[in-house]
Amino acid sequence: METFLFTSESVNEGHPDKLCDQISDAILDACLEQDPESKVACETCTKTNMVMVFGEITTAAKVDYEKIVRSTCREIGFISADVGLDADKCNVLVNIEQQSPDIAQGVHGHLTKKPEDIGAGDQGHMFGYATDETPELMPLTHVLATKLGAKLTEVRKNKTCPWLRPDGKTQVTVEYKNDGGAMIPIRVHTVLISTQHDETVTNDEIAADLKEHVIKPVIPAKYLDDNTIFHLNPSGRFVIGGPHGDAGLTGRKIIIDTYGGWGAHGGGAFSGKDPTKVDRSGAYIVRQAAKSVVAAGLARRCIVQVSYAIGVPEPLSVFVDTYKTGTIPDKDILVLIKEAFDFRPGMMAINLDLKRGGNFRFQKTAAYGHFGRDDPDFTWEVVKPLKPKA
């Protein structure tokens, strides 16, 4: 049997780049909660003892940016300098301006346009992907790496492993076989976890706890065997972490946010962007389209691309490829997709309820992936029925 290895990585919510994503989306949530028409393009950067939020926001909402920054850092666990950042004592810098009037008139005509006439906020192309190898219709490598990261945070916060600190990274290599274009996972080849820890714990204790409390509950036993390789804190020491260890920036974990290297990526990040930014809304709707194709049994694996021009409502192109796994021709699947999904930005915002913020709606997406999540707020994960014409 001919097989191959494929690897996906993840980082958990205390990684400095992910901290920035969560702050940007927490600000988006706060704006949309008060003013669903908010136009938000919010970036965050962080380094030792400093968080800065900057960008363009036009909103009627009254938002305390500094309060949101500090509370988000605190929720993640950055409560003292020795864990990487002190939420209450760090410097918070804010440089927020209004959206460019040139962009505003071209995209939404200063709010005079009907939803179906709202133009894309920028040019770009986005990809959605789905595969039948997991119940989530997501790649197994990505699912396992992401769930390991989430479990790391869970056992830190519930004090199962009190030596854990917020920063951490995971990576999973899976051995696959290609079944006529569909991906069949055979076994987990390698598991890598690098997690921040306190001064008191030994490397042996770290390895034992990670195997027992993180790996065992997450990776199904059928994928592990005597030959599975474990690299558990292979650098030997990871006490300094968070923004103290590395600078962080919004939008630097776009593969972790999506499909772990499977499918394709148009390059646009998600966090801190309202739904007129097709980097986000376009990527969400093509995930829904690809997932609907696989869920309907029309293909075992599917990728969908959409592209836009700034100020133009209709997409420039829609593309589908089922990797030769389709039960009907790809051109017929494309017809079904175009009939079932409205790719105009104003309509995507309505149909996926993307103007609704608050209650951590978008902040939740900013750690542990935007896709494959079982959560009613992830409206783009709800499949649409697709039936070929008789």
Curated annotation (Swiss-Prot):
<feature type="binding site" description="in other chain">
    <location>
        <begin position="167"/>
        <end position="169"/>
    </location>
    <ligand>
        <name>ATP</name>
    </ligand>
</feature>
<dbReference type="GO" id="GO:0009860">
    <property type="term" value="P:pollen tube growth"/>
</dbReference>
<dbReference type="GO" id="GO:0005507">
    <property type="term" value="F:copper ion binding"/>
</dbReference>
<feature type="binding site">
    <location>
        <position position="246"/>
    </location>
    <ligand>
        <name>L-methionine</name>
    </ligand>
</feature>
<dbReference type="Pfam" id="PF00438">
    <property type="entry name" value="S-AdoMet_synt_N"/>
</dbReference>
<feature type="binding site">
    <location>
        <position position="273"/>
    </location>
    <ligand>
        <name>ATP</name>
    </ligand>
</feature>
<keyword id="KW-0460">Magnesium</keyword>
<feature type="binding site">
    <location>
        <position position="43"/>
    </location>
    <ligand>
        <name>K(+)</name>
    </ligand>
</feature>
<dbReference type="GO" id="GO:0009809">
    <property type="term" value="P:lignin biosynthetic process"/>
</dbReference>
<keyword id="KW-0554">One-carbon metabolism</keyword>
<keyword id="KW-0067">ATP-binding</keyword>
<dbReference type="InterPro" id="IPR002133">
    <property type="entry name" value="S-AdoMet_synthetase"/>
</dbReference>
<comment type="pathway">
    <text>Amino-acid biosynthesis; S-adenosyl-L-methionine biosynthesis; S-adenosyl-L-methionine from L-methionine: step 1/1.</text>
</comment>
<dbReference type="GO" id="GO:0005783">
    <property type="term" value="C:endoplasmic reticulum"/>
</dbReference>
<dbReference type="GO" id="GO:0009506">
    <property type="term" value="C:plasmodesma"/>
</dbReference>
<feature type="binding site" description="in other chain">
    <location>
        <begin position="235"/>
        <end position="238"/>
    </location>
    <ligand>
        <name>ATP</name>
    </ligand>
</feature>
<dbReference type="GO" id="GO:0004478">
    <property type="term" value="F:methionine adenosyltransferase activity"/>
</dbReference>
<dbReference type="InterPro" id="IPR022631">
    <property type="entry name" value="ADOMET_SYNTHASE_CS"/>
</dbReference>
<feature type="binding site" description="in other chain">
    <location>
        <position position="56"/>
    </location>
    <ligand>
        <name>L-methionine</name>
    </ligand>
</feature>
<comment type="subunit">
    <text>Homotetramer. Interacts with GRF3.</text>
</comment>
<comment type="function">
    <text>Catalyzes the formation of S-adenosylmethionine from methionine and ATP. The reaction comprises two steps that are both catalyzed by the same enzyme: formation of S-adenosylmethionine (AdoMet) and triphosphate, and subsequent hydrolysis of the triphosphate. Involved in the biosynthesis of lignin.</text>
</comment>
<keyword id="KW-0479">Metal-binding</keyword>
<protein>
    <recommendedName>
        <fullName>S-adenosylmethionine synthase 3</fullName>
        <ecNumber>2.5.1.6</ecNumber>
    </recommendedName>
</protein>
<dbReference type="Pfam" id="PF02772">
    <property type="entry name" value="S-AdoMet_synt_M"/>
</dbReference>
<dbReference type="GO" id="GO:0005634">
    <property type="term" value="C:nucleus"/>
</dbReference>
<feature type="binding site" description="in other chain">
    <location>
        <position position="277"/>
    </location>
    <ligand>
        <name>L-methionine</name>
    </ligand>
</feature>
<feature type="binding site" description="in other chain">
    <location>
        <position position="99"/>
    </location>
    <ligand>
        <name>L-methionine</name>
    </ligand>
</feature>
<feature type="binding site">
    <location>
        <position position="9"/>
    </location>
    <ligand>
        <name>Mg(2+)</name>
    </ligand>
</feature>
<feature type="binding site" description="in other chain">
    <location>
        <position position="246"/>
    </location>
    <ligand>
        <name>ATP</name>
    </ligand>
</feature>
<feature type="binding site" description="in other chain">
    <location>
        <position position="15"/>
    </location>
    <ligand>
        <name>ATP</name>
    </ligand>
</feature>
<dbReference type="GO" id="GO:0005524">
    <property type="term" value="F:ATP binding"/>
</dbReference>
<dbReference type="InterPro" id="IPR022629">
    <property type="entry name" value="S-AdoMet_synt_central"/>
</dbReference>
<keyword id="KW-0547">Nucleotide-binding</keyword>
<dbReference type="InterPro" id="IPR022628">
    <property type="entry name" value="S-AdoMet_synt_N"/>
</dbReference>
<feature type="binding site">
    <location>
        <position position="277"/>
    </location>
    <ligand>
        <name>ATP</name>
    </ligand>
</feature>
<keyword id="KW-0963">Cytoplasm</keyword>
<dbReference type="Pfam" id="PF02773">
    <property type="entry name" value="S-AdoMet_synt_C"/>
</dbReference>
<dbReference type="GO" id="GO:0006556">
    <property type="term" value="P:S-adenosylmethionine biosynthetic process"/>
</dbReference>
<dbReference type="InterPro" id="IPR022630">
    <property type="entry name" value="S-AdoMet_synt_C"/>
</dbReference>
<keyword id="KW-0808">Transferase</keyword>
<feature type="binding site">
    <location>
        <position position="269"/>
    </location>
    <ligand>
        <name>ATP</name>
    </ligand>
</feature>
<keyword id="KW-0438">Lignin biosynthesis</keyword>
